[in-house]
């Protein structure tokens, strides 16, 4: 007969009418009983022949992905002109006095941030914008280009101008070496790029000769020179051969020749000196691509009147006859002045050699589930986290639930600050630019590659493609609608572009680490400046707490002014005042302790409503269910151990079938949530110890011992002793010498025992006491006669790695011992 829910509850000692604990609890450690219960609840039967269920409520598993929804009316968010002050350490020191070693180290990490991957894979420009929405290709292309343009205008991206130079908007940092420093700076650099000076100077010829010894493939080199691109080292990189602005077009060959000869007009003496063997008219240098000339600065030797000689793909339509009612020339002729082919930033700097490639693709999604009106750019730099050359990102400590509760559960008033575009505050060194490239190959290539018009694709490498091969009704209608949104920017956005990150991007594993270091250092400074208040951060979420509302408001004003003086942009509309219950990291934290936020409780209820019984559920769906239930597990009676059968099925990659009893058990567990309370400091006066055959307790001056009916594994025996100590004494601070009991992770014990022990020991704090000093050591070995002196072991609540009381460094700094005795648990501990 299957086990009923009531019987199962009684078995786990969750009901009050259970017998004496010393008899009942050791039974739960019995392997035979655990196996029988698992069979009764159908937990062990992992091989099932019925088809798996792949969807439970909103949770989907294998073979199904959520279809992203494209919104043609997405607004591109605006970015303030974010510029974090370079002398941030000096400004903090003016505010709070000398910084601690920790604060200084963290702030130096991000001024500027550096990124050196082992290997960088370069992808063709066509992969720059991902075809994420096949139905809305053109629309998505322009929206993404507009987003990238907005980021560039806000000083978040560099624009690659030539192989060795980039331009950007906004205020420069000292490590961004300006191009206009005069001739001296060029001698130290391996690249000769001149942004403003005239094109053929002797300086460059000197330069080229010096580099020529390294060149074997001179043919590629001559082909690379166009406009301002003086890429010398490019020949080393066979992947970086194509000129920067490449667009297949009707006049591909002719334009290319013109550009070759035109660029020779300015540099012929230099050219011939450096490359005597290379002919300027190389037939194969043009693979059907028009070379664009927007790389030339407006005041260079080429005059404005010559521009029509090298028309760009977009403007070529102006002179051609419409091929149909949907010809692109009809759109191009709507405007007389389409504006420049390219924009250049306010500052030009030197960068390491950057090929005309991208290293990651981009696409747009909704800003968040609650805001579908605005878009968010997703950058896929996952190449750095994959494969043999993956970068192992630095680990950083995040406070666990208990530490967080100890820190923040108090009778303070709270408010949270919203840092706008937090990642884009942290500057990246220009040396990282070649590794973090995004961009696009221009509209013509994008449409050609993704259109069903095979003529375009076939013509790319053979005969000259016809300009009007691109015209189609879909493209015409899309562009006409986009023309109403973007106007003459359609022309600018239809050109190829390559952008590198100037601030840290979100798609790299290094960024969360750097952001966490930055905000925690700033909060540490604020805590020392206002010792009677509390400031705490997780990523970009910063919270302030103070004793009264008036006090909090004045703290808010002072901290806001301080953050603004550092160049940190706050979003005043999103400042939230929480009163005494702080909503933070998915929890509600008040003076009673922590509970999950209401929306998570609703999600759990919804999950149980949709959870089928007696049907095998795909283990991928089980992962999603465990993710949700695991978040709230610390607030239930049995905690994580209750989810162990689910964990086991996920590990063995088998389907899981919920029996009615197990589902009812979990459902009841999650309907009544108990707050996790903050730990209080105190003295430990109750000690527990065990041997495989017996247990012993010391409570004040009272000592007890007992034996087990059969020998047990030592960890199990120690856990039982701790449970007896708690139930006998009611004390919430217990001394033990077992590291597993100390860790309060009961998932490795027999399943029923783990569930019962979690409930008995809920809210208990443990203090480590070495075996040699443990007063309960003798009773556990059956010796009650000898009485050891009672230890006075103080218990201090843990706050993880967050030091709330960092000593200001005017005191001579010495590092205190973290742990005062060789605790196996603390030695082996890694940040969660």
Curated annotation (Swiss-Prot):
Coiled-coil stretches, from where to where? none
Keyword terms: DNA replication, DNA-binding, DNA-directed DNA polymerase, Endonuclease, Host-virus interaction, Hydrolase, Inhibition of host innate immune response by virus, Inhibition of host RLR pathway by virus, Magnesium, Metal-binding, Multifunctional enzyme, Nuclease, Nucleotidyltransferase, RNA-directed DNA polymerase, Transferase, Viral immunoevasion
InterPro entries listed in its UniProt record: DNA/RNA_pol_sf, DNApol_viral_C, DNApol_viral_N, HBV_DPOL, Rev_trsase/Diguanyl_cyclase, RT_dom, Viral_Replic_Matur_Polypro
Q: What is the effect of changing residue 749 to Y?
A: In strain: Latvia
The listed outcome for residue 118 to N is: In strain: Latvia
Q: Where does Mg(2+) bind?
A: 418, 540-541
DNA-binding: present as a keyword of the record? yes
Annotated spans, Polymerase/reverse transcriptase domain (RT): 336-679
Provide a GO biological process annotation. DNA replication
Instruction: Report the domain of life of the source organism.
Output: Viruses
Disordered, as annotated region: 186-225
Q: Region (Terminal protein domain (TP)): which ranges?
A: 1-177
The family database entries (Gene3D superfamilies) matched by this protein are listed as: 3.30.70.270
EC numbers: 2.7.7.7, 2.7.7.49, 3.1.26.4
User: Boundaries of each Reverse transcriptase domain copy?
Assistant: 346-589
Quote the SUPFAM superfamilies the UniProt record gives: DNA/RNA polymerases
Query: Mind telling me which Pfam families this protein's record contains?
Result: DNA_pol_viral_C (PF00336), DNA_pol_viral_N (PF00242), RVT_1 (PF00078)
Activity regulation annotation text? Activated by host HSP70 and HSP40 in vitro to be able to bind the epsilon loop of the pgRNA. Because deletion of the RNase H region renders the protein partly chaperone-independent, the chaperones may be needed indirectly to relieve occlusion of the RNA-binding site by this domain. Inhibited by several reverse-transcriptase inhibitors: Lamivudine, Adefovir and Entecavir.
Q: Which reaction does it catalyse?
A: DNA(n) + a 2'-deoxyribonucleoside 5'-triphosphate = DNA(n+1) + diphosphate; Endonucleolytic cleavage to 5'-phosphomonoester
Q: Keyword NAD, does the record have it?
A: no
Q: Where is this site: Priming of reverse-transcription by covalently linking the first nucleotide of the (-)DNA?
A: 63
Other remarks in the entry: Hepadnaviral virions contain probably just one P protein molecule per particle.
Can you tell me which family this protein belongs to?
A: Belongs to the hepadnaviridae P protein family.
- Name this polypeptide is given: Protein P
User: Which source organism does the UniProt entry give?
Assistant: Hepatitis B virus genotype D subtype ayw (isolate France/Tiollais/1979) (HBV-D)
Q: Which gene encodes it?
A: P
